[in-house]
Amino acid sequence: MNVDDFDFELPDRLIARHPPAQRRDARLLALTCDALEHQQFPDLLSHVHPGDLLIFNDTRVIPARLFGQKESGGKVEVLIERVVDDHEALAHVRASKSPKPGSWLEFAKGIRAQVTGRRGALFILHFSLPGNGCDTLLSALELIGHVPLPPYIDRPDEDGDMERYQTVYAREPGAVAAPTAGLHFDDAMLAALEQRGVDIGFVTLHVGAGTFQPVRVDKVEDHHMHSERYQIPGSLVEQVAQAHARGGRVVAVGTTALRALEAASQSGGLHAGQGETDIFIFPGYRFRLVDALVTNFHLPKSTLLMLISAFAGRDRIMGAYRAAIEAQYRFFSYGDAMFIEGTQPASRNTQHVKSGADE
């Protein structure tokens, strides 16, 4: 399968570089089994039914972008990929010359980081913190960090991004990119779902910067995915079992929630626990758990476009994207949304495991 099969031309004007005035002020392109409908995001309520289970990713975006300088005075930009502990992180570092092991990077407020090594393309940074309320890496990021907006937004972060590039239900800090399908939901929308009899559950998958990395091979099968941390709570396993028992569907809000659910279902049934996944979903994949998906519009030739093509069929997805471009939908993180029904029923292995070893 060729990566070029997932290419399309997108006018630059359709890239959303700012969020809408209100979270729910987005359009919704609904791709169901028998129709393609142009709607508004609150119309999602007409596509979910009492007894369905909507599963959200509750990861919280950290202000992971830092600007500083090397000991030589040269400028440096750091994007934290993963917080390892209170003082150590794995990070992407941009500078005119890569910093050497043992060298120091200096930031605002007396915060410094020593380069202690490399792990592949990532730098291992050990932070020296000034104390006085800034004694952990997360607290340092809250003090001097910037919102890690995606590269295609192509502007500096603004005060409003701290709120809007974050879901209203975010609670587990660790992501460096937002699970953007969830950005459309406000508290009123969540309440309306519950009033409709729709159950709501949460997974955690800490989205990494690798989600924006281009596919650099010609054949889809040759691509290797980046790894991300996830956690499936035992309470969610119970919710999934109950939804299946009453005939409800599992609806993933976002590709990150879907990847976590599918990763934790590879051995049959949903397994509680935490672990890492580099699951790569592309056409030919057999879905084990997810029946429907809420998602934003994705980049050409991206792994996420391949994922939704696996879910609903490449021809149907590419046709829907052509219709969206013709209708002037807004694309990517701050853009509009889709509701997609899968073309195949998810496997119904009911041997869900509430607790067990990490996967």
Swiss-Prot record:
The gene is queA. PANTHER family: S-ADENOSYLMETHIONINE:TRNA RIBOSYLTRANSFERASE-ISOMERASE. This is S-adenosylmethionine:tRNA ribosyltransferase-isomerase. The keyword Repeat does not apply. It is found in: Cytoplasm. Pathway: tRNA modification; tRNA-queuosine biosynthesis. Pfam families: Queuosine_synth. Its EC number is 2.4.99.17. GO terms for molecular function: S-adenosylmethionine:tRNA ribosyltransferase-isomerase activity. The lineage of its organism: Bacteria, Pseudomonadati, Pseudomonadota, Gammaproteobacteria, Oceanospirillales. Transfers and isomerizes the ribose moiety from AdoMet to the 7-aminomethyl group of 7-deazaguanine (preQ1-tRNA) to give epoxyqueuosine (oQ-tRNA). Belongs to the QueA family. GO terms for biological process: queuosine biosynthetic process; tRNA wobble guanine modification. It catalyses: 7-aminomethyl-7-carbaguanosine(34) in tRNA + S-adenosyl-L-methionine = epoxyqueuosine(34) in tRNA + adenine + L-methionine + 2 H(+). It comes from the Bacteria. Monomer.
